[in-house]
From Swiss-Prot:
Pathway: Purine metabolism; IMP biosynthesis via de novo pathway; 5-amino-1-(5-phospho-D-ribosyl)imidazole from N(2)-formyl-N(1)-(5-phospho-D-ribosyl)glycinamide: step 2/2. Belongs to the AIR synthase family. Pfam families: AIRS, AIRS_C. GO terms for cellular component: cytosol. This is Phosphoribosylformylglycinamidine cyclo-ligase. It comes from Burkholderia pseudomallei (strain 668). NCBIfam families: purM. It is found in: Cytoplasm. GO terms for biological process: 'de novo' IMP biosynthetic process; adenine biosynthetic process. The gene is purM.
Length: 351
């Protein structure tokens, strides 16, 4: 029997030769530990680096229900790569999940992230994770763990993908599911910070067509900064509102815009009628509509059009809710009312 052929003169291979740099991964962990530490809150048991992250549900909950959400940043990342701007997409990642679980009344407790790339650039990854930690601080949740996956040939150099996972808790008796929404209720709209993290495939197509100077001034900042403005996190002002006022329903205005997200919290037979003149269309959306020739109906089903969160309360509570949110620093408008649906009508209409 012949022995297996070998190459005695060839140098032995290492994981680094295959494209995975374990030392870079270790260096990243060292860089991000201080960011994660700033997000620690009551309930965290242990620190980053264990096989699993431990969290004790706060004792203030008598019948806690856990609420989970997961999301990404979508093709906004392609614009981040083009601009070499990585400091805000981490906040986007957190916002997409914590705002989603917030609408059911949940207080975000902890967050985990997944960062995938072909070749790990420690500085870029650390910048992204610093943004994630900033988002967690704004949401009051702990960055409790994550995964960095360096996968040679899976992604081009300089590119990466992100996913985030948020878990929160709500008292079982205080779950917000839209079941109490009734005719005559008022829809409040909280201002977005910009495009947030949806519709960027269309945004990039408009940029391709218009070929603008992204460094040019756009209402006091560069057009690039306006396009990349991080998604607003509504957690703290809305949790405070829920302590004082009976919030009947909330909708995070993400993919599908106003007309496809508000119906997710409405019972059959109800329609939210929104007045498009009740709030100003921000200049960035005007620019996108003008340079893309985008129809009004398409704008309303792709973009948030200046409204990042819709909150539904009774007519009797509407003024108090407006006042409290404004005092908390939110821009907010009465943007519509709830009424009985007409035959064959959509559950959200913009007039």
């Amino acid at each position: 029997m012949n022995p297996p052929k070998s190459a005695p003169d060839a140098q032995g291979l290492s994981y680094r030769d295959a494209g995975v740099d374990i030392d870079a991964g270790d260096a990243l962990v060292d860089k991000i530990k201080p960011f994660a530490k700033k997000t620690l809150r009551d309930g965290v048991l242990g620190g980053i680096g264990g096989f699993g992250a431990l969290f004790e549900v706060p004792k203030k909950y008598r019948e806690p229900v856990l609420v989970s959400g997961t999301d990404g940043v979508g093709t906004k990342l392609k614009l981040a790569f083009h601009l070499n701007k990585h400091d805000t997409v981490g906040q986007d990642l957190v916002a997409m999940s914590v705002n989603d679980i917030l609408v059911q009344g949940a207080e975000p407790l902890f967050f985990l992230d997944y960062f995938a790339c072909g070749r790990l650039d420690v500085e870029t990854a650390a910048t992204v994770v610093k943004g994630i930690a900033t988002g967690c601080e704004l949401a009051g949740c702990a960055l409790i763990g994550g995964e960095t996956a360096e996968m040679p040939s899976m992604y081009p150099d300089g590119e990466y993908d992100l996913a985030g996972f948020a878990v929160g808790a709500v008292e079982k008796s205080k779950i917000i599911d839209g079941s109490t929404i009734a005719e005559g209720d008022v829809v409040l709209g909280l201002a977005s910070s910009g495009i947030h993290s949806n519709g960027f495939s269309l945004v990039r197509k408009i940029i391709e067509r218009a070929n603008p100077d992204l460094s040019a001034d756009f209402h006091g900042r560069s057009l690039a900064d306006a396009l990349m403005a991080p998604t607003r996190i509504y957690v703290k002002p809305l949790l405070a509102l829920m302590e004082k006022i009976a919030v009947k329903g909330m909708a995070h205005i993400t993919g599908g815009g106003l007309v496809e997200n508000i119906p997710r919290v409405l019972r059959d037979g109800l329609t939210a009628e929104l007045d498009q003149h009740a709030w100003p269309l921000p200049p960035l959306f005007q620019w996108l509509q003008q340079h893309g020739g985008v129809a009004d109906a398409e704008m309303h089903r792709v973009f948030n059009c200046g409204i990042g969160m819709a909150v539904i309360v009774s007519a009797a509570d509407a003024d108090d809710a407006l006042r409290q949110l404004a005092d908390a620093g939110e821009q907010v408008w009465k943007i519509g009312t709830v009424r009985a649906s007409r035959e064959g009508e959509a559950q959200t209409v913009v007039v």
